[in-house]
Amino acid sequence: MAAKKVVKQIKLQVEAGKANPAPPVGPALGQAGLNIMEFCKQFNERSKNQMGLKLPVVITVYSDRSFTFVTKSPPAALLVMKALGLQGGSATPHTVKVGTIKRAQLEEIAKTKMEDLNANDMDAAVKIIAGTCRSMGVNVE
């Protein structure tokens, strides 16, 4: 059997367990001619253990209108805000600091993100997350 032809890839960020046909999911999938409710059911089932987090999802659309999707780990900035209990980062990160994060918290976030990061080892992953923290106005200890 020949491999299916990939027509399109759609990248979205959807809250775990709360995918529904409303924007942004509905219009993006509708344009590709996909069954929106089928995606919503599968995504909600797969992501129900990560409720409350926005998950990046990459949907691969095939020529026969079937699809597959891969959920990634939540954005690093979201995990940092959750760890520190923040609503958002600093508008001026180099002058106004909004919090301080410890090395242990960075390592925990890096473990969660490791499969999606372009890092060879844990130390490199921690440095990537630390850079995200600095750009948000969070001090790194």
Curated annotation (Swiss-Prot):
Gene3D superfamilies: Ribosomal protein L11, C-terminal domain, Ribosomal protein L11/L12, N-terminal domain. One of its GO terms (cellular component) is cytosolic large ribosomal subunit. SUPFAM superfamilies: Ribosomal L11/L12e N-terminal domain, Ribosomal protein L11, C-terminal domain. One of its GO terms (molecular function) is large ribosomal subunit rRNA binding. Pfam families: Ribosomal_L11, Ribosomal_L11_N. InterPro entries: Ribosomal_uL11 (IPR000911), Ribosomal_uL11_bac-typ (IPR006519), Ribosomal_uL11_C (IPR020783), Ribosomal_uL11_C_sf (IPR036769), Ribosomal_uL11_CS (IPR020785), Ribosomal_uL11_N (IPR020784), Ribosomal_uL11_N_sf (IPR036796). Keywords: Methylation, Ribonucleoprotein, Ribosomal protein, RNA-binding, rRNA-binding. The keyword Ribosomal protein applies. Forms part of the ribosomal stalk which helps the ribosome interact with GTP-bound translation factors. Part of the ribosomal stalk of the 50S ribosomal subunit. Interacts with L10 and the large rRNA to form the base of the stalk. L10 forms an elongated spine to which L12 dimers bind in a sequential fashion forming a multimeric L10(L12)X complex. This is Large ribosomal subunit protein uL11. It comes from Leptospira biflexa serovar Patoc (strain Patoc 1 / ATCC 23582 / Paris).
